[in-house]
From Swiss-Prot:
The keyword Lipoprotein applies. Pfam families: Dymeclin (PF09742). A lipid is attached at residue 2 (N-myristoyl glycine). Keywords: Lipoprotein, Myristate, Phosphoprotein. One of its GO terms (cellular component) is Golgi apparatus. The modification Phosphoserine is found at residue 347. The keyword Phosphoprotein applies. This is Dymeclin. One of its GO terms (biological process) is Golgi organization. InterPro entries: Dymeclin. It comes from Drosophila pseudoobscura pseudoobscura (Fruit fly). Belongs to the dymeclin family. Signal peptide: none annotated.
Length: 700
């Protein structure tokens, strides 16, 4: 079987492509032409430079296409060929469909390349014009005669017909009713959801997902709102939102590794998919996550590995985020579908179920890749809006598999972008809304946490390391980001957990009190500066005005108050289980002196003073009997005293319970963030020079 292999280098001079973008109409049933055009192998661009090289080699062909297609309608013919091949695929056996899959992929790749070019250089209306463009009657007649004549005769006929039709076709408007475009979208969805993912169909599924992303990228290049976009309206009125969302989430959960060859072909170009390769396909498709497990990569490095080895999962994840974060002000069937899915191992009795999926597979995959932005965003959506998935996660016995990677993202804050830090903290806040979670994290013990380098800790609870990382994030934010909302989310998570603090590691107790101490020193400095005369040196720096300092002081007092309430909540509810915290408070009692008479803090400090006074007097009595006490002896006295302590002595405060509430107009945050991730970590590389509506310089 002879196969024409077209490499990137010779695409610009390919005779079939030149005819396709030329001035002659090519009918969709011209099998000789389409077989010639679609019999090529191509290495897909792997990065922006590859895409740039491909774009530059195709530039002349694309310009010819733009100049001629509205007259020839060849793009519409290609779309029709794709529609026919997609329809035929559903009825073919594996062996019969290999060549079909290959040609369908090639047709779709050409369509995507042209759609991308039109998006980047034209308008959405022009894109739809090219989809719907029909050839003139003269060109159609010439194409019919072309198929019937000898090469010499056909060339003469085509030239004559082209010259006769050129003037009329150039001025005739192309009417856009969107019918072919809608049919094309439906075919893409059918391809994704109906055809099973096998080794030789993997790249076809990937190309279909990439095609949808490329179509929706019209948002990047248009200056109109998506509510007015015909592309968005067509995609979002799709009747099959549930099955598409189900397929995409299954692609993510299964994390199938990209096959070593495309369409089951060997390096020699054979398209035979034999028994041996079938067995190899089954074997390689089951060997999941080995690459990522072996590397132990996180963050940006993991994102690149995920894109390279699991492109279908990566692109499906990005498409899920696009579909669920756009059009949130009105009914969004994709969003409702994701939020309404249920575990396939359950039989939900309440609420509408959009589709069922193995939550265990989703959970395990998210645990593995949650250090990448797009996975954190998906986890956020599922936890925040899918109650069934939230309950499922809360029942897991290995919560450390999910929480530790999130903590690593926060720990590596200088290497993470602010959006990712923010979303990771929100996920922790949502998790901390569950009392079961707050109890369980202190029963899960961890050993030898090598990535935490501040101090060597041989053993600590998951709750303990969580507290340490959140405190560290607060301190990092104070120095670098100064984001009030970041402080709020950090403290809200700690506050939710505080009533369940147990068996705190000595270092955790020290860091909790040290956090207050650090904030207290800053408060004292700011307060002193504000009380200095207005003409003193403190105001020489015009950037820091008195108003700025007053605002800083107000925020600082809110944070200090919250830290005191967190300490008070722990002492009120868990004092008997937190001897190390009591020990640290006794040792650091002086840090509270300046706040006993402060109107904003005195009621909470009074409780802490009462606890410190109770244990201090007991220690004093024991010391009078035994002399100086060692650390273990002090802890023994605290433990005995705790058994006799009654929290009824303390002033009552409301329980600390905070719930995450999404801000107004969340799309203003999420849409630019999602498209930044698509541009940075996706397999489709767009021209950054042409992007108008979304800045892609968010540090990812």
């Amino acid at each position: 079987m002879g196969i024409n292999v077209s490499r990137t280098a010779d695409l610009g001079s390919n005779e079939w492509l030149q005819r396709f973008v030329g001035r002659h109409h090519i009918a969709h049933d011209d099998e000789a032409f389409w077989n010639g055009l679609l019999n090529y192998n191509i290495v897909l661009p792997e990065n922006s430079q590859d895409q740039l090289n491909l774009d530059s080699r195709l530039e002349t062909l694309c310009q010819s296409f733009i100049g001629n297609n509205l007259k020839t309608g060849n793009f519409g013919s290609l779309v029709t060929v794709f529609l026919e091949k997609t329809s035929e695929l559903l009825s073919l056996s594996d062996q019969e469909s290999n060549m079909h899959v290959w040609q369908t992929f090639n047709a779709l790749f050409i369509i995507r390349t042209l759609v991308k070019y039109i998006n980047e250089t034209g308008s959405e209306f022009q894109l739809l014009q090219h989809f719907e463009a029909l050839p003139s009657a003269e060109l159609v007649q010439a194409a019919v005669e072309l198929q019937q004549q000898t090469p010499a005769e056909s060339a003469t006929i085509a030239i004559e017909a082209t010259e006769q039709a050129a003037a009329a076709a150039a001025s005739a408007p192309v009417f856009v009713d969107g019918a072919k475009f809608e049919t094309f979208i439906d075919a893409l969805v059918n391809l994704i959801v109906v055809i099973p993912v096998k080794e030789f169909t993997y790249h076809l599924h990937l190309e279909a997902v990439n095609m949808l992303i490329t179509l929706l990228s019209v948002h990047l290049f248009a200056q109109q709102p998506t509510e007015k976009s015909i592309v968005f309206r067509t995609v979002f009125k799709c009747q099959h939102a549930n099955v598409l969302m189900s397929a995409l989430l299954h692609f993510v959960a299964r994390m199938v590794e990209v096959p070593h060859t495309m369409f089951g072909s060997s390096s020699a170009g054979s398209i035979v998919f034999g028994i041996a390769e079938s067995l190899l396909s089954i074997f390689t498709f089951r060997k999941q996550q080995d690459v990522l497990k072996a590397s132990n990569a996180v963050g940006g490095e993991l994102s690149l590995q995920f894109r390279t080895h699991y492109p279908l999962a990566n692109q499906s994840l990005l498409l899920i985020l696009i579909l669920t974060n756009h059009c949130t002000a009105q009914e969004n069937a994709y969003r409702a579908s994701l939020f309404g899915c249920a575990d396939s191992k359950d039989s939900p009795k309440q609420g509408t179920v959009s589709f069922q999926i193995d939550f265990s597979a989703v959970y395990e995959t998210l645990c593995r890749i949650v250090t990448i932005d797009q996975a954190t965003l998906l986890l956020y959506l599922l936890l925040h809006r899918n109650e069934r998935f939230y309950r499922f996660v809360m029942q897991q016995q290995d919560l450390e598999q999910l929480v530790i990677p999130i903590l690593q993202t926060l720990y590596n804050a200088p290497d993470s972008n602010s959006h990712h830090i923010y979303m990771s903290l929100i996920v922790l806040l949502i998790l901390s809304e569950d009392e079961g979670f707050n109890k369980n994290v202190h029963t899960i013990m961890l050993k030898n946490i090598t990535w935490y380098t501040e101090r060597s800790i041989s053993e600590i609870s998951l709750g303990g390391i969580l507290i340490l990382i959140v405190i560290r994030t607060i301190q990092y934010n104070m120095l670098k980001m100064r984001d009030k909302y970041l402080h709020t989310n950090c403290l809200a998570a700690l506050a939710n957990m505080s009533g369940h603090f147990r068996a705190l590691h000595p270092y955790v107790a020290q860091r909790l009190v040290s956090l207050f101490e650090t904030l207290a020193r800053k408060h004292t400095r700011l307060d002193a500066q504000l009380k200095e005369p207005a003409d003193s040196a403190v105001f020489v720096n015009v950037v820091t005005t008195a108003e700025d300092m007053l605002q800083d002081l107000s925020v600082l007092e809110e944070v200090l108050r919250m830290v005191l309430e967190i300490l008070n909540s722990c002492l009120t509810n868990q004092l008997v289980y937190c001897p190390n915290l009591v020990y640290t408070l006794l040792y650091k009692r002086s840090v509270f002196e300046g706040f006993r008479s402060h109107h904003a803090f005195q009621d909470v400090v009074q409780n802490i003073d009462m606890v410190v006074g109770f244990f201090s007097s007991r220690l004093q009595r024991v010391q009078e009997q035994r002399g100086e006490l060692g650390v273990n002896e002090v802890l023994e006295v605290i433990s005995k005293g705790a058994s006799q302590w009654s929290s009824d002595r303390l002033r009552k405060f409301p329980d600390l319970k905070f719930k995450y509430v999404e801000e107004d107009a969340p799309e203003e945050f999420f849409i630019p963030y999602v498209w930044t991730l698509v541009c940075k970590y996706g397999c489709v590389h767009f021209s950054s020079e042409s992007i108008k509506t979304v800045t892609t310089d968010i540090a990812c």
